[in-house]
UniProtKB/Swiss-Prot annotation:
Bilayer-spanning residue ranges: none
Residue pairs linked by disulfide bridges in the UniProt entry: none
Cell inner membrane in keyword set: no
Encoding gene (name): pabA
Domain Glutamine amidotransferase type-1: start-end pairs: 1-194
Name listed for the protein in its UniProt record: Aminodeoxychorismate/anthranilate synthase component 2
Residue numbers annotated as active site: 79, 168, 170
Species whose genome carries this gene: Bacillus subtilis (strain 168)
Length: 194
């Protein structure tokens, strides 16, 4: 079962729909309507942190959940969720030089885990005004996708089953979004079984 922390974003249910189409069981909880103990009781196989209209500091239980469950269950963050992952581990989330709302970018990726078997570069849809500052990304992370300008578009933890994407895989304008989600689940389901 996947627990989706909903950061009050309209895109959350697009993610939920994609994951449902992949045959996954989902529980969705708003970021202010669940506690760490309640998450423990649900015993999810995966934790996903949704996009949202705010900063990581305003994302309810998202930061605490990432801290608590890092290394216990696979975690995937989208947009705000991605920024929250970086911040938990010591990265700085700052105002982007260019606001990206409903704009697409070609991103180059490393072809591993979530990007395995996907076209390179691929088109990613962006809706954000904040971004992870590249020089502050902790050394425990690898940048797995970026724009030609060097903006971080995806990260992967080097040792733990944690990944984040700055763009929106659930947007119809993003290439291979559903495949990325499938790749995440298939890659890290092994971690759940182990």
């Amino acid at each position: 079962m996947i627990l989706m922390i909903d950061n009050y974003d309209s895109f959350t249910y697009n993610l939920v729909q994609y994951l449902g189409e992949l045959g996954e069981e989902l529980v969705v909880k708003r970021n202010d309507s669940i506690t760490i103990d309640e998450i423990e009781e649900l015993s999810p196989d995966f934790l996903m942190i949704s996009p949202g209209p705010c900063s990581p500091d305003e994302a309810g239980i998202s930061l605490e959940a990432i801290k608590h469950f890092a290394g216990k269950i696979p975690i995937f963050g989208v947009c705000l969720g991605h920024q929250s992952i970086a911040q938990v581990f010591g990265g700085d989330v700052v105002r982007a030089e260019r606001l990206m709302h409903g704009k697409t970018s070609d991103i180059e990726h490393d072809g591993k885990t979530i990007f395995e078997g996907l076209k390179n570069p691929l088109v990613a849809t962006r809706y954000h005004s904040l971004i992870v500052k590249p020089e502050t990304l902790p050394s425990c992370f690898t940048v797995t996708a970026q724009t030609k300008e060097g903006e971080i578009m995806a990260i992967r933890h080097n040792d733990l089953p944690i990944e984040g994407v700055q763009f929106h895989p659930e947007s119809i304008m993003t290439s291979f979004g559903k495949e990325m989600l499938r790749n995440f689940i298939e890659t890290y389901r092994k971690e759940v079984i182990a």
